[in-house]
């Protein structure tokens, strides 16, 4: 029965296997045989399942494997063909684009490195890449053309396509048709002459005046302009890398010791660098094209000087960049740096605008502190609001770039700023206060460019005007000592003297009491008032000097003392209040039970006496006296404690209340100090203390 049941499922499984459906097998009953009544252990079912499953797997493999193998082989062949066609097409495209047959620059050397430790290249697509040419004899960076090698300055799209294998999708299409520059003509070795297909530097091309820049839309808004025509050669060093050296010179124009605007590494012969006065403002060109405009990234050199980020720098006309010649002038215009050069100007005439990031010399780590400043070249018309990290909101006219007269600069700073230039043996330092206006004249160093010169031996002056009322002069020398500028004369700091309305009177200058033997205006003696005069009519057995008691008038009618005896017997509290002084002792005195009802003058004297004697010695005396009292009270309670009529809490409470009661009956000046006095007091007051303890025992005992 079981075998027939499983055999019934075989044809269905066979049909599924013949149909070639992968993953379709036998039924659940066939795959998972379970024992039944005839086959309790499932041995027969397992044997049948193993035999059947082996046949099915063999049939499936035989039908599927050939198809899978053929499919994989076809895909590999197709993929290989596509890769071959793609590689061939890309190589042909590169050859057609470069216009030469030979070693491909993108395959030999994908990136043109300008310097070993400097990288001016950014990612392709968004940020513009500065035009750089390396004219050294490197095989990967040269282009073979007509028997001689030429090299052209790559634009942003071409440079990104050479380095990354693809051109920028947003690039300018006109730049692709622009002619390339012949490198051999610049070196004087071009043999083709006018028939050369490459553009010579002296020739004029119609497509050279166009501007190519940042098409990726960066936030800085900086552009890179194409070099225009010029009849003279560009500035070159011994290696021939003209644009590279110009770029490095402009990068180091601001920051290298701030003495001149020349790069300290460039020490070669100087050639005249031609540049027109045109500049680019807000995406439009002026009448004259600009010869060299290079983008400045953020560069950090060894002297840790901040450079401008994303601003435009242009060169003036007939300017020479060397260590001994004329110096240039930097201006901020429309968010761009304008680079002006005049031969007759000296380093002191150079006008260097305030950078966006400056050092804060007040901090030891010399981090760059951004700040907001308002700079106005013309206080009546033109003003520019510079943000903390760059950018401009207004454009200034071109006439402010070439002015050599006095330029008025007003500052409204939000924080204290300062300069400190490193790398000199003489350094100048100054502080600019808030709301400080400065005026710099021609021939003097402006206020915000107090930088030292090696050959400077005279003083430079700058005038301050704070609030338009007071004026002072700042003299800055080139010595090694720092000079700090202060706006106006500072008034000395005066401490406010607090004057009280009531004159101060010492605590010991109290008025003399009536009956006192001390002269007037004498210091108060606490010992005089520590003992009150007796107010009882007669106490023959007590001395006057040892009595310090006062009985109020409202209680005199009940207990009237006559001739040392009482009409009525004293209460228990009154008996306890009487101390050993009642027997003629000179150490203690008798006080009444209602001592709190004394006159105000006596009470004040007692309080003052207690405050003056509340010191460490008094505390020690109290502790000794309390210790002896506690021991005496414990001896009195001990027989009752042994009988078992007192609990532990009741014993502690009786001892505590008894000692507190005795202490409350004594004044601080009546406390026995020595052990002999303490023993005498306890012996004399033993009956009173015993009665007090007995009263507390009767109250708290448990019968």
UniProtKB/Swiss-Prot annotation:
Region (Disordered): 1-42, 112-176, 204-242, 442-481
Keywords for the protein's UniProt record, in alphabetical order: DNA-binding, Metal-binding, Zinc, Zinc-finger
GO molecular function: DNA binding; zinc ion binding
Zinc fingers, C3H1-type class: 176-203
InterPro entries tied to this protein: Zinc_finger_CCCH (IPR052650), Znf-CCCH_4 (IPR041367), Znf_CCCH (IPR000571), Znf_CCCH_sf (IPR036855)
Biased composition range(s): Polar residues: 149-169
Compositional bias ranges of the Low complexity kind: 9-25, 470-481
Residue ranges with Basic and acidic residues bias: 112-125, 451-468
PANTHER family: PROTEIN FRIGIDA-ESSENTIAL 1 (PTHR36886:SF3)
Stated name of the protein: Zinc finger CCCH domain-containing protein 36
Organism: Oryza sativa subsp. japonica (Rice)
Taxonomic classification: Eukaryota, Viridiplantae, Streptophyta, Embryophyta, Tracheophyta
């Amino acid at each position: 029965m079981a075998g027939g049941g499983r055999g019934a499922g075989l044809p269905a499984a066979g049909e599924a296997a013949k149909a070639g459906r992968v993953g379709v097998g036998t039924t659940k009953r066939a795959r998972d045989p379970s024992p039944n009544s005839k086959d309790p252990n499932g041995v027969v079912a397992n044997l049948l399942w193993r035999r059947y499953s082996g046949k099915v797997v063999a049939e499936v493999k035989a039908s599927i494997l050939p198809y899978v193998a053929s499919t994989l082989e076809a895909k590999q062949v197709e993929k290989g063909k596509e890769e071959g066609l793609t590689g061939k097409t890309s190589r042909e495209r590169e050859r057609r684009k470069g216009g030469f047959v030979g070693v491909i620059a993108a395959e030999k050397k994908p990136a043109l490195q300008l310097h070993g430790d400097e990288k001016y290249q950014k990612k392709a697509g968004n940020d513009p890449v500065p035009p750089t040419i390396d004219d050294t004899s490197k095989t990967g960076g040269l282009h073979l053309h007509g028997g001689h090698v030429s090299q052209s300055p790559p634009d942003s799209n071409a440079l990104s396509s050479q380095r990354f294998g693809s051109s920028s999708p947003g690039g300018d299409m006109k730049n692709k048709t622009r002619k390339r520059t012949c490198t051999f003509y610049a070196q004087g070795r071009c043999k083709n002459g006018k028939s050369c297909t490459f553009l010579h530097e002296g020739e004029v091309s119609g497509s050279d005046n166009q501007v190519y820049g940042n098409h990726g839309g960066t936030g800085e808004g900086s552009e890179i302009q194409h070099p225009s025509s010029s009849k003279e050669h560009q500035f070159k060093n011994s290696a021939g890398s003209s644009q590279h050296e110009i770029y490095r010179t402009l990068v180091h124009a601001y920051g290298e010791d701030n003495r001149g605007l020349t790069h300290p590494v460039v020490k070669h012969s100087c050639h005249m660098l031609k540049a027109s006065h045109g500049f680019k403002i807000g995406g439009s060109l002026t009448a004259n094209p600009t010869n060299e405009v290079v983008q400045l990234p953020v560069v950090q050199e060894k002297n840790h000087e901040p450079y401008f980020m994303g601003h435009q720098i242009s060169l003036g006309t007939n300017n020479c960049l060397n260590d001994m010649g004329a110096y240039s002038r930097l201006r901020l215009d429309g968010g761009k740096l304008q680079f002006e050069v005049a031969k007759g100007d000296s380093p002191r005439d150079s006008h260097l605008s305030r950078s966006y990031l400056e050092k804060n010399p007040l901090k030891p780590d010399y981090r760059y502190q951004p700040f907001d400043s308002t700079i106005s070249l013309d206080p009546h018309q033109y003003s520019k609001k510079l943000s903390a990290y760059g950018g401009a909101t207004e454009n200034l006219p071109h006439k402010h770039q070439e002015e050599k007269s006095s330029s008025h600069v007003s500052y409204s700073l939000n924080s204290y700023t300062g300069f400190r230039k490193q790398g000199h043996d003489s350094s100048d330092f100054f502080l600019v206060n808030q709301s400080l206006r400065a005026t710099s004249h021609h021939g003097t160093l402006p206020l915000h460019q107090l930088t030292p010169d090696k050959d400077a031996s005279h003083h430079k002056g700058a005038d301050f005007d704070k609030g338009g009322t007071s004026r002072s002069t700042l003299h800055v020398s080139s010595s090694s000592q720092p000079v700090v500028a202060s706006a106006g004369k500072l008034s000395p700091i005066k401490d406010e003297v607090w004057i009280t309305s009531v004159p101060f009177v010492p605590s010991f200058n109290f008025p003399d009491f009536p009956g006192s033997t001390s002269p007037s205006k004498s210091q108060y003696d606490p010992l005089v008032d520590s003992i009150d005069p007796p107010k009882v009519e007669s106490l023959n057995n007590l001395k006057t000097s040892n009595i310090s008691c006062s009985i109020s008038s409202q209680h005199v009618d009940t207990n009237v003392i006559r001739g040392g005896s009482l009409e009525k017997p004293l209460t228990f509290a009154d008996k306890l209040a009487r101390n050993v002084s009642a027997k003629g002792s000179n150490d203690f005195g008798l006080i009444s039970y209602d001592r709190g009802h004394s006159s105000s003058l006596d009470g004040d004297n007692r309080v003052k006496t207690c405050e003056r004697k509340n010191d460490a010695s008094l505390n020690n005396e109290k502790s000794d006296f309390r210790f002896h009292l506690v021991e005496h009270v414990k001896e009195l309670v001990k027989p009752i404690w042994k009988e078992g009529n007192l609990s532990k809490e009741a014993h502690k409470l009786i001892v505590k209340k008894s000692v507190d009661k005795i202490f409350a009956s004594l004044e601080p000046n009546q406390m026995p100090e020595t052990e002999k006095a303490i023993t005498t007091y306890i012996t004399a007051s033993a009956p009173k203390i015993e009665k007090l303890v007995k009263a507390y025992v009767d109250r708290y005992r448990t019968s």
